[in-house]
Amino acid sequence: MIVAEARRCNYIIKSNAQILRQANSKTIGIMLPSVSNPFFAELAAVIVDEVKRRGYNAIVSVTNESEVDQESCLSSLMARDVEGVIAAPCGSNQNLFYSVNRDMAPVVLVDRFFIDSNISYISSNNMGGALDATRYLINKGHKRIVCIQGDQNLITNRKRVEGYRKAMTEAGLEDNISVVGDSFSVQNGYFETKMIVGNRSSLPDAIFALSYTTALGVMKALKESNLTAGKDISLISFDDNMSLDYMQPEITRVAQAVDEMGKFAVKVLFEQIDNPQTVSQIELNTKIIYGDSVAEL
């Protein structure tokens, strides 16, 4: 709807954008796929705080991983004269964001982004983080490592799987590559782990859960199966959350710089408000937080 209208009334949109900049609404739109997911909840809090620190108001919209809701949210934000948008997109319709960024208001993507796009984004080095995590498992003697992935359409998931595959291949373990699952959810982690541990005679050495929520499902399934992470099977997670510190055992995980990501997103957006030609594409380093869930084999 936005793209079609942009093409049909391009001159009107450009005129409105000029009026918007003059009007100075001092409002920023934030679009996230979920606020029940701890990662996005934390990211939203950082972005809102940083926007308010700059004397602006923030409108937070939730797309529920729906492209239809995403387009509706963008339309609503444009109708409310936001000066810029920070979004974690769902789906593959980059033209939607390109049109808004070009004709209506600056857009900065956060966490998720589009490859070969001239739209600014702030994300993590997802491939590097997964590469480091898998190498860590391999260096601890693990050879049969199962990767529980999320939605294959998400760039963050694809990059993490790419890092896992690269580490396995460079170690000569390409025949042991095993990628299962289809969402960054507790349910997915639980279901896939139940399938993995169903045959006790062929347990893998380790599970690499590609999100914090997936790791929660893994832990639940292991507990129900009377298996202990770090003893019967090793576990490492991508994503950090303070609750992992209080689990028994404490989960080894790849931490993203969520605070830095949110602050950078706001900084880049305001740079684009001042200079619409600015494009910044940044991938932040991750780090491994060591717990007790990885055994030495």
Where are these regions (language model features)?
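N-terminal helix-turn-helix DNA-binding module of bacterial transcription factors
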Residues: M1-K26
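Alpha-helical recognition/docking segments in bacterial nutrient-uptake
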Residues: I19-R135, N139, V197-S202
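Generic beta-sheet signal
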Residues: A88, V110, I148, I236-F238, ...
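Short acidic capping loops at alpha-helix termini that bridge into adjacent secondary structure
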Residues: R144-I145, E174-I177, T228-L235
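Flexible loop/turn connectors
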Residues: M195-L297
